[in-house]
C-alpha cells in the first residue's frame, strides 16, 4: 500500500514521473517494480561502481499519463472483495497493472 500512497501523492502534487532504479542483477526488485506498475525503461550500463564492480542500473517509471489506469488497478487490488476470508488475494496486483505498463522487462 505504501507504493500506492506514494504514487498517489506524487501525481496529485503535479510531478510527471515516479522512478524506480535498482541494480540490474536484483531480479526481485525488478519484479516488484513491474508488479507495482512501473514500466521498464532500460538498463544504464556501468552506471556506477559498487564494491569494486561495475553496476548496471535497471530503470523503471510511472508517468502521469499512466496514473489513471494504475490507480484503478490498485483500487481493484485493494478492494475488500479481492481478498478471500483468509486474506489470500483473488487477483494478483501484477495482473491488474500489466495492461497499464508501457513496456515489460525483457530480463524477467
Give short role names for the model-derived ranges.
Residues 1-108:
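Acyl-donor (CoA/ACP) binding surface of acyl/acetyltransferases
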Amino acid at each position: 500500500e505504501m507504493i500506492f500512497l506514494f504514487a498517489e501523492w506524487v501525481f496529485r502534487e503535479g510531478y510527471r514521473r515516479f522512478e524506480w532504479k535498482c541494480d540490474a542483477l536484483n531480479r526481485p526488485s525488478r519484479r516488484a517494480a513491474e508488479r507495482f506498475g512501473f514500466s521498464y525503461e532500460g538498463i544504464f550500463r556501468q552506471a556506477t561502481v559498487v564494491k569494486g564492480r561495475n553496476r548496471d542500473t535497471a530503470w523503471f517509471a510511472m508517468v502521469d499519463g499512466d496514473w489513471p489506469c494504475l490507480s484503478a488497478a490498485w483500487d481493484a487490488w485493494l478492494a475488500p472483495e479481492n481478498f478471500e476470508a483468509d486474506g489470500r488475494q483473488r487477483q494478483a496486483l501484477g495482473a491488474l497493472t500489466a495492461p497499464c505498463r508501457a513496456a515489460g522487462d525483457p530480463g524477467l
